[in-house]
Each structure stands twice: as structure tokens, then as C-alpha cells.
Amino acid sequence: MKWTVLLLEYFLVKVLVLLYSADGEAQQLEGFIMLSGSNGSRDEESVSEPPHTEDKCRGYYDVMGQWDPPFVCQTGNYLYCCGTCGFRFCCAYKNSRLDQSTCKNYDTPVWLTGQTPYKKTLDPRHDPTKDKTNLIVYIICGVVAIMALVGIFTKLGLEKAHRPHRESMSRAVASVMQGARQGQHEEAIGMHTQHYDTVQARANNMQAGQINNMMQTHPYPALSQLSHVYEQQQSAKDLNKYASLKAVAAKANGDFLNKQHRHLVELAAKGNLPLHPIRMEHVEPTATYVTEVPCIKQNGQKPKSIKANVSHPAMAYSSNTIANPGMLRSWEAAETAGRRKTYNPRKMCMVEQVNELHTARSHHYLPTQPYFVTNSKAEVTV
């Protein structure tokens, strides 16, 4: 029973509270309507506010202690000062507007005003005029430069001192070698001159014999006279050919000696010539001398040809016909004084016998056509 009474009381209290709250809201609403009805013109004036055109950001000290001057936000839609107290900027949103009255960084910070400028304290014992550190560096560089110059000049002096000795040695060696080459060259020229004199004497003897034979008169031209004329022409050709070959050989020898001389001079100039003497051998080209000489027998047999191979040590010499038997001999080789002169025995026919046979025939028979023997394979009779 007791609990029932308590529940009823609680229920009644709730109902009364609800009623009281409903009456209070009705009274507030009636009072608001009355106020709005009595002050309508003032509310209309407060609603029609002018549009926001600009906002000014005040000057402040940023977090680095630097002063940022004030600026105005009036560009386009960026009409509000936004950001933080240490970093401010213009924006277009009103709800992001910064309340600048709450910031405290409009005055100089305490940590910035408390610093004092650093002053360099000079040591009274230190005298900058007596500081010799730079002087030591200059002294070291100067000593190094002087040592380098001394080394360079010493090297140049040593080279200059040894140069005259080297030049004198090279000149002496070159002169000795040049004298040896000149002696060899003169010896070779003497050999060629001796050969040329021998050939010239033989040619003169041959021409004298031909003139004596031509002085004889015959009723008809003898075969011996025609053969002598042909042989004279051949001997002149042989002499010309020999002279040309001699000139070519002398030129070749001179070029060879000049090349050797130039090479030795270069070696002497370089200073690397050997100290021991060098033996230079003069090698001359060799060639064979081939000819055929007809040999006519008394009994009327066919003539036989004798081939003689003669090696000439100085130059090559060849011809088709020999004028006299003396030219069949080998050229005398006079390279050294101790060499022996060798001759190969050959069977030869005397041209005088041939001339006598042709002279005897010319008195009894009519002159025949001259027949000349050459080395060519196809012999022609004129």
C-alpha cells in the first residue's frame, strides 16, 4: 500500500512538471511575437547589412622574429584575413576568418630583445704586425722555386759541357770513315780505268790492222774487206755499249757509297757509333759474257762454233760478234793486289787465217755474197 502511494505521488509530480514546461514555452513564444510585432523596423534594418568589401591584417612578428608589415585583403573574393597569429594570409571564407584580437605577437619578442651583439675580444698579447705565418709560406715557396731553377741550369750546363766532346768524336769518326770510302772509291775507279785503257788499246790495234788490210787492192771486193768493215762497226757499237755500261755502274757505285756515307754521318751525329772498326766489303755485280766465233777449217769441213763464258768482276758486257781474238780473253780482275789472274784455255781460230783463205778464193772465183755469223737463232744471208 505504501508503495502504491509513492508511485502515485511520483506520477503527479511528473504531470505537473510537464504542464509547467508547456506553459513556459507558450509564454516565451507569445512574448517573442509581441516583441517582433512591436520592433519590426529595427529587425529589418539589422538584416540588411552592407556587403563585406575588405579586411585588414595587422602587422606582427613571425616565428622567426621578423616583422611582417600590415596588408589589406581586397583582391577578388579574397576579402578575409585568415591563418594563425604567426602566419596570416587572405582567404574567401568568412568562417575561416582570424580573430586578430586574441594574438599577442604585435610587440617585439623578449628573446629577440635580450640578445646583445657579439664583440670580438682581442688578445692583448697578440700583435698582428708580428704574425709571420704568411712569411713562412712565402719562404718555403721561394726555396722550392730556387731549387728547381738550380736543377734546370745544372742539367743544361752538363749537356753543354759534354756536347763538344761528342761532336769532336763524331767528326773524327766521320772523317775516318769518309777517307776509307774515298780510298775504296778511287781503287774501284782505277780498276775501271785500267779495263777501259786495255779495251781502248785493243781497239786501236784492231783498227790499225783493218786499215792495213784495206790498203791491198783486188780486182773484186774481197770478203775479208767486207768482214773488216762490219767488224769495225760492231767494235764501235761494242765500245759505245761498254762506255754506257761503265757510266751506269759508276753511278750505281757512287749512289751506294753516298747512302753509306749519309747513314754513317747520321750514326755519328747521334753518338751511337761502335768503337771497333767496321770492315766494309765492296761487292760488284757479275755477269756472263757469251759469244760464238766461227772457225773455218782448211779441209772444207763445216765450221764449228766455240762458246766462251767469261765472267767480268766489275760490270756486265755482251755483244754478238768479236772483232779480234784478243777480246775473247777474260777481263783482268784487279780487286786486290794478291789475287791471281786466271785465264780459261779456249780453242780459238785466228782471224788472219780466215782472211788469207778469203783472199785466195777471191783471185780464182767471183766474189760471193758475204756471210755474217751472229748469235741469233735465225741467221739471214744478204
From Swiss-Prot:
- How is this protein situated with respect to the membrane? Single-pass type I membrane protein
Q: Which residues are glycosylated?
A: N39
Keyword Transmembrane helix assigned to the entry: answer is yes
Q: Extracellular compartment: which residues?
A: 27-132
Provide the primary localization: membrane
Localized where? Cell projection, Dendritic spine membrane; Synapse
Q: Which residues cross the membrane?
A: 133-153
A Gene Ontology biological process annotation?
regulation of short-term neuronal synaptic plasticity
Cytoplasmic face of the membrane: 154-382
Report keywords, A-Z. Cell membrane, Cell projection, Glycoprotein, Membrane, Postsynaptic cell membrane, Signal, Synapse, Transmembrane, Transmembrane helix
Q: Name one Pfam family in it.
A: Shisa_N
Q: Name one GO cellular component term.
A: dendritic spine membrane
Q: Which residues form a coiled coil?
A: none
Q: Family, per the entry?
A: Belongs to the shisa family. SHISA9 subfamily.
The record's subunit annotation is: Component of some AMPA receptors (ionotropic glutamate receptors) complex.
Q: What is the name listed in the Swiss-Prot or TrEMBL entry for this protein?
A: Protein shisa-9A
Q: Which organism is it from?
A: Danio rerio (Zebrafish)
